[in-house]
């Protein structure tokens, strides 16, 4: 293994699946969101891309730090307990965290509190932003994200700062809140969280957003042509999300709550959600499910029943 390979593997191994539906992604493809929420969509395996993501996060932190040192705008990145400002809905299964809140961003209304949102972009994307109509027109996902933040924190405006990773150019804009976006996204998230099967894809299987931005493995799982690599509680037919906790899940096979570590590990009683198998069900017996694939029968059973 070369040094570059080791760098890449370190990034890949360091990934952790998100426990909730984040406001940064909730405006996106509902099928992909469902697969990610069920810990079934393959994680990135490209270390270089993961390093770019990490670099973007570091740049965004640096911008917040520079704003604090400038002193022109008052910045608060954490609450009184030193925690990042967060919001959550639907029993903790949907949520988000903001880069901070600011005052004095508008000289005409210096005491107004605004959301602070910092992004980074490569040169091509940055030029698209500069030449476009607005930040919200630039990215639907970012538009939904900032609208959800403003509504969740009951603020009317947000200060946007976008940093060009190629030449350090900076773009700023103040975005106005719009009614209804958060409510719409909460309803979307609720449908995803409650669903036992993935929502229909908004794209055809040959759409460029699938072919260009997904690996072959990701495409196969997205199109339900292949089972996920990861076996865990979230893609098991026995589990379900609980809405009266903090992102809680329950196993109906053992009639008990399951914590994050248990969810990630799974157990020998795992049975695939039938929607992920994506074959006609031929029969159910003793916890096992039999599927028909042409003339062949395929049985998905807990490990202790395998081969019986």
Where are these predicted regions, by residue range?
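Soluble or luminal CAZymes and related metallo-dependent hydrolases
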Residues: 55-59, 141, 181
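Short, glycine/acidic-rich beta->alpha junctions
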Residues: 92-93, 138-143
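Residue-level recognition of conserved beta-strand positions in structured domain cores
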Residues: 102, 118-120, 162, 253
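Conserved active-site beta-strand-loop modules that form the wall/rim of enzyme catalytic pockets
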Residues: 111-118, 156-160
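Metal-dependent nuclease catalytic regions and adjoining charged, substrate-binding loops involved
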Residues: 128, 136-140, 148, 152-255, ...
């Amino acid at each position: 293994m070369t040094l570059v390979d080791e760098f890449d593997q370190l990034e890949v191994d360091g990934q952790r699946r998100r426990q909730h539906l984040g406001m940064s992604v909730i405006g996106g493809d509902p099928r992909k969101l469902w697969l990610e929420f069920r810990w079934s969509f393959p994680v990135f395996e490209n270390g270089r891309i993961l390093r770019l993501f990490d670099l973007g996060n570091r740049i965004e932190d640096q911008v917040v730090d520079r704003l604090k040192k400038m002193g022109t705008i008052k910045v608060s990145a954490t609450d009184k307990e030193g925690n990042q400002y967060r919001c959550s809905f639907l029993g903790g299964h949907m949520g988000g965290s903001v880069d901070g809140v600011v005052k004095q961003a508008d000289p005409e209304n210096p005491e107004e509190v605004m959301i602070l949102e910092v992004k980074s972009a490569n040169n091509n994307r940055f030029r698209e932003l500069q030449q476009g109509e607005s930040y919200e027109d630039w990215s639907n996902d970012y538009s939904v994200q900032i609208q959800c933040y403003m509504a969740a924190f009951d603020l009317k405006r947000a200060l946007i700062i976008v940093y060009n990773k190629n030449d350090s150019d900076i773009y700023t804009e103040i975005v106005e809140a719009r009614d209804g976006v958060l409510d719409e996204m909460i309803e979307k998230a609720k449908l995803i969280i409650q669903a036992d099967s993935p929502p229909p894809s908004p794209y055809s299987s040959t759409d460029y957003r699938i072919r260009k931005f997904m690996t072959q493995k990701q495409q196969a799982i997205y199109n339900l042509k292949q089972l996920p690599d990861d076996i865990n509680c979230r893609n098991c037919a026995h589990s379900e999300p609980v809405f009266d906790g903090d992102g809680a899940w329950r196993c109906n096979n053992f009639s008990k709550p399951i914590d994050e570590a248990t969810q990630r590990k799974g157990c020998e009683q795992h049975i695939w959600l039938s929607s992920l198998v994506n074959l006609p069900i031929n029969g159910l017996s003793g916890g096992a499910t039999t599927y028909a694939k042409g003339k062949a029968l395929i049985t998905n059973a807990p490990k202790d029943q395998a081969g019986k």
